[in-house]
């Protein structure tokens, strides 16, 4: 399962490979955020806390997220400590080693979580996304160095494979920018009532547009899918269950048969694209606000009909955006395997999506 842990380095900046104090990185916080967002969508109490309690409610949910991140970080820390135990020096108590290592790892993870929250509070950008962005950037020198070294060997197939991969990455970057910036502009018209000395009347209608993004979730579906796909490995290592270990090995991106991993990753990205779109875009609220403001979509009745129309448009847009994200996450990896060029493993399509997406969001 070594290749699975290598993929987790996008959350840790190489921490897992180097086994540093910050080996867990932002991963426990990402997992905790996923759990809380799923619970918020399914539990009325949490949903009410987020929507109706204002800033106090959001702070309460943030506090719950921290506690969940701490708990999940402890579980992952113990798992890693138990894996590392076999490499420890002789004469060290197993219990002492596991406890000390787990405490160091979970403390490092909590420090990273705190830094991400400071970044968010200072208005620099979305903290967790920027931490992952910086982690990926931190691996670039090593990746580029390995690529240059491979090209200098003079092997024709290797050089050709690198050129093909670079072209695929360039096309991918263009596609990411297009999808991240793409939106469906729905025409809307408004007619304001005029009250004055001349009596009551209606001003001429004004037409503008309501933009619905092609990829409403941004890079979050990729980040969430990347985190969730590692959960079976963590659970398998924690329980030592033979069946779970065999099942988790199917999700190894470096396995002889990569299709189970590819299909699972694709399905997770598509699922989280819909999930995150439902969190960021609420057709019912939009329709209600349009109706209150005297704004309508031509040919669509205000109210529930508008909500149904917007929901249908958003679902189609999310399908297109999710299919694109899933394809972009898989195709470059397939090309990498076909060309047998392994130097870009530290900068896969997933990392590229996060780099470009976070850069665009932060620039705004």
Positions of PLM-derived features:
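Short, small-residue-biased leader/transition segments that mark boundaries at the very start
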Residues: 4-5
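Hydrophobic alpha-helical transmembrane segments of multi-pass integral membrane proteins
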Residues: 18-41, 63-81, 102-111, 129-139, ...
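Helical hairpin unit composed of two closely spaced alpha helices linked by a short loop
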Residues: 208-323, 327
């Amino acid at each position: 399962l070594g290749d699975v842990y290598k993929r987790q380095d996008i959350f840790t900046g190489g921490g897992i490979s180097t086994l540093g104090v910050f080996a867990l990185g932002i991963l426990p916080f990402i997992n905790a955020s996923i759990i809380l967002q799923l619970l918020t969508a399914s539990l009325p109490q949490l949903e009410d806390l987020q929507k109706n309690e204002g800033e106090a409610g959001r702070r309460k949910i943030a506090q719950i997220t921290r506690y969940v991140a701490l708990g999940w970080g402890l579980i992952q820390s113990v798992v890693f400590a138990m894996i590392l135990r076999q490499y420890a020096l002789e004469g060290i108590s197993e219990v002492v080693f596991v406890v000390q290592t787990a405490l160091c790892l979970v403390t490092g993870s909590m420090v990273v979580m705190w830094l991400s929250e400071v970044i968010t509070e200072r208005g620099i950008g979305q903290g967790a996304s920027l931490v992952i962005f910086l982690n990926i950037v931190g691996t670039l020198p090593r990746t580029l160095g390995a690529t240059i070294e491979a090209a200098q060997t003079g092997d024709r197939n290797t050089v050709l494979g690198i050129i093909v991969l670079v072209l695929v990455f360039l096309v991918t970057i263009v596609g990411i920018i297009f999808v991240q910036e793409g939106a469906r502009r729905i025409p809307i018209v408004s007619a304001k009532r005029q009250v004055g000395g001349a009596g009551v009347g209606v001003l001429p209608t004004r037409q503008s547009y309501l933009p619905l993004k092609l990829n409403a979730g941004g890079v979050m579906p990729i980040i969430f899918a990347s985190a969730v796909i590692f959960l079976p490995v963590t659970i398998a290592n924690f329980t030592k269950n033979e069946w779970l270990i065999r099942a988790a090995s199917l999700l190894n991106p470096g396995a002889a048969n990569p299709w189970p991993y590819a299909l699972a990753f694709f399905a997770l990205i598509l699922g989280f694209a819909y999930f995150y779109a439902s969190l960021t875009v609420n057709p019912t609220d939009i329709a209600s606000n349009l109706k209150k403001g005297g704004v309508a979509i031509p040919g669509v009745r205000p109210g529930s009909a508008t909500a149904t129309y917007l929901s249908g448009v958003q679902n189609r847009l999310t399908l297109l955006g999710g299919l694109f994200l899933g394809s972009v996450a898989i195709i470059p990896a397939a090309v990498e395997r076909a060309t047998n060029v392994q130097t870009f493993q530290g900068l896969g399509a997933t990392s590229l999506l996060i780099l470009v997406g976070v850069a665009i969001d932060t620039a705004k």
